[in-house]
Amino acid sequence: MDGNYTLVTEFILLGFPTRPELQIVLFLVFLTLYGIILTGNIGLMMLIRTDPHLQTPMYFFLSNLSFADLCFSSAIVPKMLVNFLSENKSISLYGCALQFYFSCAFADTESFILAAMAYDRYVAICNPLLYTVVMSRGICVWLIVLSYIGGNMSSLVHTSFAFILKYCDKNVINHFFCDLPPLLKLSCTDTSVNEWLLSTYGSSVEIFCFIVIVISYYFILRSVLRIRSSSGRKKTFSTCASHLTSVAIYQGTLLFIYSRPTYLYTPNTDKIISVFYTIIIPVLNPLIYSLRNKDVKDAAKRAVRLKVDSS
């Protein structure tokens, strides 16, 4: 690299380059989706916190999953909404670092929480007599603390290595937020270490969580198949239905990100995938756990009745 370069102090987020009238339409669509994310996840957290019937480890984990979803989207969507209405789509170097750090931290935290939820279901179904001992309040809190520590440590590694790089002259990020792959393309220094970290350390977090989930469900399935009555098998496995659906959507998306062939790495493909896991999944999770869970539906009905009776 020669000495004739200018260090970048801010980036331009290209976002979704379309006609101005379509920008307004996209703004309204994503604003509506973000409103659903806020309402759904905050509503679910409040319901779990206030309803005495939902004070179990499973719902404690679910409440933290909703919090991680909410924070993950909130690290990205507000800036994206502002950029739809503004001609100035810039973000400072430090702002970009913060956005990337928090989005990466909460994404990885969510993976760890989903793994903890799978372990919780394993203990509940395979060792029901020891459930209250194994999944005590203290253990549950530690699992959540470790999930947040794991997510933040992973993010700290990626953020530190990404922002010690020099960015010269080119400053247009072909994305709607500061994500690592499009950011690395702008660096004027060697990014081989970052690319190695992304493909090994980054994927190892998801692979570890995926392995925990697969092993947990292997033992769950073995226990369920030992139940003689079909109604008993169905009732037992139904307690995992919401979690399995959530895992299939989230981990399926991440597995596609890490396993897709190189010819599928295009900016537009990345944007579509990013919209799915930053916005669509946080919209779907509260719906999945509300519509497919009898306890949550009953708690919602009790909350509505209480509100009606008190008014």
Swiss-Prot record:
Question: Which superkingdom, per the lineage?
Answer: Eukaryota
As for membrane topology, the entry says: Multi-pass membrane protein
| GO biological process per UniProt | G protein-coupled receptor signaling pathway; sensory perception of smell
Where do glycans attach?
4
| GO MF term list | G protein-coupled receptor activity; odorant binding; olfactory receptor activity
PROSITE patterns recorded = G_PROTEIN_RECEP_F1_1, G_PROTEIN_RECEP_F1_2
**Keyword vocabulary terms for this entry:** Cell membrane, G-protein coupled receptor, Glycoprotein, Membrane, Olfaction, Receptor, Sensory transduction, Transducer, Transmembrane, Transmembrane helix
Question: Main site of residence?
Answer: membrane
Name a single GO cellular component: plasma membrane
What residue intervals traverse the membrane?
Answer: 25-48, 57-78, 100-119, 139-157, 196-218, 236-259, 272-291
Localisation per UniProt entry: Cell membrane
Q: Which residues lie on this side of the membrane: Extracellular?
A: 1-24, 79-99, 158-195, 260-271
What CDD domains does this protein's entry cite?
A: 7tmA_OR5D-like (cd15410)
Q: Which residues are on the Cytoplasmic side of the membrane?
A: 49-56, 120-138, 219-235, 292-311
Q: Which residues form a coiled coil?
A: none
> What family does this belong to?
Belongs to the G-protein coupled receptor 1 family.
What biological function has been recorded for the protein in this entry?
Answer: Putative odorant or sperm cell receptor.
Q: What is this protein called?
A: Olfactory receptor-like protein OLF1
Species in which this protein is naturally found: Canis lupus familiaris (Dog)
